Amino acid sequence: AVSDLQYLLTFAIMAGVGTSFNLVNGNLRYQAQKHSTLHQQIRQLYEFSRKLSEALVYQQVFDALDEFFPRLFKAKYALLTPSLAEELTVNHNQLGERLDLTIARWVFDKGQPAGLNTNTFAASQVYYVALNSQLRTRGVLALIPESPLDFFLPSEQELLNNFIANIATTLERIHFTQIAIQTEVLLAKKID
């Protein structure tokens, strides 16, 4: 009876140690995978920023968005930017009929997110976020994530905010560059 109790105690201790090692190993594997994913995302965001820094016209921004958005996010998207008359123009639309221009206009005017996972237009399955630059809103990005639970994690939202800030800053830079060119052309015409 004593030896059976001794075997049972030894087995329980070994099972506890084995379970502990398994949990620690699983946690380390998970952390390593998250670190690798984060490293890849940072590298992609850096490449995206570099490509945007070279952009001289809006189409180059749209092309960079088409190239890098699928690499960083598991979501379909639509990009809307204002015309000179402040009308929102759809530049790229993977959302089809689910894109609501009324909600997009509200987001553009207010500069705040709306739709999915917000308190504004919460019934919508689309998440609308403003492309806010230093001076004003430069457009709206509408998204339908494959997995809303993963998409709205703080780390994913931080990545999205950095991504959006890069787009907004680039759109603003291009806008002011175009205004400067137009002004220069007008001044040249007045001199002649």
Model-derived regions: residue spans:
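Signal-transmission/dimerization alpha-helices at domain junctions
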Residues: 14-27, 159-182
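Histidine-centered phosphotransfer motif of kinases
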Residues: 192
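Conserved, well-folded catalytic cores of nucleic-acid-processing
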Residues: 18, 31, 38, 72, ...
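Alpha-helical transmembrane segments and their interfaces in multipass membrane proteins
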Residues: 1-15
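Membrane-proximal extracytoplasmic alpha-helices
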Residues: 7, 11, 40-41, 68
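Membrane-proximal helical linkers
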Residues: 23-64, 179, 184-188
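Membrane-embedded alpha-helical core segments of multi-pass
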Residues: 13-21, 40-43, 73, 136
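GAF sensory domains
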Residues: 47-173
